[in-house]
Amino acid sequence: MKVSLFITCLSDVFFPQVGKSVVEIMNQCGVELDFPEGQTCCGQPAYNSGYQEDAKLAAKQMIKAFEHSEYIVTPSGSCASMVHHYYKEMFKGDSEWYEKAVHLADRTYELTDFLVNVLGKNDWKSKLVEKAVFHQSCHMSRALGIKEEPLKLLSQVEGLDIKELPYCQDCCGFGGTFAVKMSSISETMVDEKIKHIEATEANLLIGADMGCLMNIGGRLRRKNKNIQVLHVAEVLAKGLNK
């Protein structure tokens, strides 16, 4: 099986360790992984801001970059949902690119979805002794319907005590450009999220979207809270070396 890694902007620039963790996970699974260098931003910021033509240019570049990939895996539900849902919306009325967009979407998987539903991983051998909570990101849970997959994998990590996070599916306030355009509302939302995290007395927050982790993690640091923030890929990969 050959898999191409769609790294995403946030992992490339801010969370390179997440990309490295995905590579370690795929190696553990015996998957042949490549990295198409022509990949770029999925176009979501431009699309959400109303710059349709710019978003189309990004989408076309992505389609070209992964044209020959058997499977495409990304550690981001947000970017995966962009490819799955909005590429097809953008190219309605353009039969050539619409078909290419559908073909790309059919081969693109969020990481935990791929591990559970394609590779059938139900015996993940890793160990990490922490008390943790898991944050459900909006795009991943609502747009893609991926809710149980990350929890199923995390339940297999020896020593990891997952506490239930109240209102776990409530938005953290990131929302891409929303956090910039409506920063005061975003700040209120993330403070509410942190209140619920603290109520669990967990010392580790796990998520599957780096936008959420950047937003919550940044706010935790500004408030001097001693709560670590990790992507689910980092948790699964860390345990491999224990």
Curated annotation (Swiss-Prot):
Originating species: Bacillus cereus (strain 03BB102)
The family note in this entry says: Belongs to the LutA/YkgE family.
Q: Quote the protein name from its UniProt record.
A: Lactate utilization protein A 2
Q: Tell me the function of this protein.
A: Is involved in L-lactate degradation and allows cells to grow with lactate as the sole carbon source.
Q: Which residues form a coiled coil?
A: none
Print the organism lineage.
Answer: Bacteria, Bacillati, Bacillota, Bacilli, Bacillales
An annotated GO cellular component of this protein is: cytosol
The alphabetized list of GO BP terms reads:
lactate metabolic process
InterPro entries, per this entry? Cys_rich_dom, LutA
What is the superkingdom listed in this entry's lineage?
Answer: Bacteria
Give GO terms: molecular function aspect only. oxidoreductase activity
Q: Which Pfam families match?
A: CCG
Matching HAMAP family: LutA
Q: Mind telling me which residue stretches traverse the membrane in this protein?
A: none
